[in-house]
Amino acid sequence: MNELGRHILAEIYGCDGEILNNKDFIEKIMVDSALKAGAEVREVAFHKFSPQGISGVVIISESHLTIHTWPELGYAAVDVFTCGDRINPWDACNYMTEKFNAKNMTATEIKRGIFEQVVEVKASNI
């Protein structure tokens, strides 16, 4: 089965709340995780919420990494989407999990852009 990309949706639990509320450290971990996976970083944007929590995106040539943190819960929601077969998105997810001092990570991988069977869609008058 050929796909255009792999998209991992990771639920990372039991993380260090101080790490999850440190914007600069989260940005560094996200960029480093992209680089460790072999991706080429293009742009980054991160925002710290009041009183806590961070959302951010790392745009890579191969697609993107995103994060949303809940430091008070020790929880991070992470997406890693990579196009092509040169980058392994699991490398980035595993690196982040380690750096967040997480106790548990569950994840789902979705194959994106599978074109094995073309389905014809017809417009209908509703």
Curated annotation (Swiss-Prot):
GO terms for molecular function: adenosylmethionine decarboxylase activity. It comes from the Bacteria. Signal peptide: none annotated. The modification Pyruvic acid (Ser) is found at residue 63. Its cofactor is pyruvate. Keywords: Autocatalytic cleavage, Decarboxylase, Lyase, Polyamine biosynthesis, Pyruvate, S-adenosyl-L-methionine, Schiff base, Spermidine biosynthesis, Zymogen. Binds 1 pyruvoyl group covalently per subunit. One of its GO terms (cellular component) is cytosol. It catalyses: S-adenosyl-L-methionine + H(+) = S-adenosyl 3-(methylsulfanyl)propylamine + CO2. Its EC number is 4.1.1.50. InterPro entries: AdoMetDC_C (IPR042286), AdoMetDC_fam_prok (IPR003826), AdoMetDC_N (IPR042284), S-AdoMet_deCO2ase_core (IPR016067), S-AdoMet_deCOase_pro-enz (IPR017716). Pathway: Amine and polyamine biosynthesis; S-adenosylmethioninamine biosynthesis; S-adenosylmethioninamine from S-adenosyl-L-methionine: step 1/1. The record marks 62-63 as: Cleavage (non-hydrolytic). Pfam families: AdoMet_dc. GO terms for biological process: spermidine biosynthetic process. Is synthesized initially as an inactive proenzyme. Formation of the active enzyme involves a self-maturation process in which the active site pyruvoyl group is generated from an internal serine residue via an autocatalytic post-translational modification. Two non-identical subunits are generated from the proenzyme in this reaction, and the pyruvate is formed at the N-terminus of the alpha chain, which is derived from the carboxyl end of the proenzyme. The active site is at residues 63, 68, 83. Catalyzes the decarboxylation of S-adenosylmethionine to S-adenosylmethioninamine (dcAdoMet), the propylamine donor required for the synthesis of the polyamines spermine and spermidine from the diamine putrescine. NCBIfam families: SAM_DCase_Bsu. Belongs to the prokaryotic AdoMetDC family. Type 1 subfamily. HAMAP family: AdoMetDC_1. This is S-adenosylmethionine decarboxylase proenzyme. It comes from Clostridium kluyveri (strain ATCC 8527 / DSM 555 / NBRC 12016 / NCIMB 10680 / K1). The gene is speH.
